[in-house]
């Protein structure tokens, strides 16, 4: 079994056309300039179900997963990506009250499935700026649902 590289990883976006239904087509490439995608591998919280008769250890069952407050992809800032993200944030003002979320589809070359995350895009701020550095910053998404690994959806652009 061969290992896989991060070379060629891509992030696609698509809005739900029906509230609560992950799109299966219509994804478009967000950016070729993403430099870091954070982990999104959260274990469920443990629910204590220890009976009073237990004398040795606490018993737990899986509870809800906390997807956190922020999913921040880092990228090289450029006008195209900044405009695209700002458009997603603007669309959120209309779609989120209707229960329609933005979906990210993250593809890794050589992996048959893609990873899906839905949420609300957040307006960009000013990134850190320092001498002799690339202008990079974060594209923030407030997670709504962890779609997990699933069949790749069709996309409009590669």
Regions found by a protein language model. Name each.
Residues 2-74, 120-135:
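Solvent-exposed edge beta-strands and adjacent loop segments
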Residues 44, 80-83:
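Short, charged helix-to-loop "capping" segments that act as catalytic/coupling loops
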Residues 71, 75, 100-102, 137-139:
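Residue-level detection of beta-strand scaffold positions
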Residues 77-80, 146-148:
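Acidic glycine-/aspartate-rich tracts in secreted/extracellular proteins
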Residues 83-118:
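Short, acidic/charged, Gly/Pro-enriched secondary-structure junctions
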Residues 105-151:
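Short beta-strand and beta-hairpin "edge-sheet" elements
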Residues 153-158:
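Intrinsically disordered, low-complexity terminal/linker regions enriched in Pro/Ser/Gly
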